[in-house]
Regions:
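A short, solvent-exposed beta-strand micro-motif common in secreted/extracellular proteins
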Residues: 66-77
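Short, ordered, surface-exposed loop/turn motifs in non-cytosolic proteins
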Residues: 21-38
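Beta-strand-rich domain onsets/edges
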Residues: 1-22
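Short, acidic Ser/Thr/Gly-rich low-complexity loop/linker segments typical of extracellular
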Residues: 35-60, 81, 86-88
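Exposed beta-strand and adjacent loop surfaces of beta-rich binding modules
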Residues: 11, 26-28, 69
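Predominantly extracellular/luminal cell-surface or secreted proteins
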Residues: 17, 32-34, 75
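Extracellular beta-sheet/turn segments enriched in Thr/Pro/Gly and aliphatic residues
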Residues: 1-4, 82-107
């Protein structure tokens, strides 16, 4: 996606689709459990480079070791969770600086 980024950027991105595979646009995506307690947020549909419901959140600039797993969660327009928190451990490898996490509604 970002061939010239090298080690200058680390993030999580993906798509959110319904059970039929249609894009769900306008959900909040949050990433948390940063050492300083920060929660970062974006909306689905803002990053069409990944697809119609694409999202992206920067984790670090430059790529660095993140000491603990982070979580990602979807919320509706009222900020009510519509998914569980999914934990993931970012890699400090420059070749693995983009983490792709896709969500699919199952009911």
């Amino acid at each position: 996606i970002y061939p010239n980024a090298e080690c200058s950027w680390m993030g999580v991105a993906g798509l959110v689709n319904d059970a039929r595979g249609d894009p769900i646009i306008g959900l909040y995506v949050q990433v948390g459990n940063f050492p300083d307690g920060e929660i970062r947020e974006t909306l689905t549909g803002l990053f069409p480079i990944y697809g119609e419901s694409g999202y992206e959140i920067t984790i670090a600039r430059p790529v660095m070791e993140i000491p603990q797993p982070l979580w990602i969660q979807l919320l509706n327009e009222s900020h009510v969770p519509v998914s569980e928190k999914v934990y993931f451990k970012p890699s400090n490898s420059c070749e693995r600086s983009l983490i792709l996490i896709n969500f699919k509604r199952v009911r």
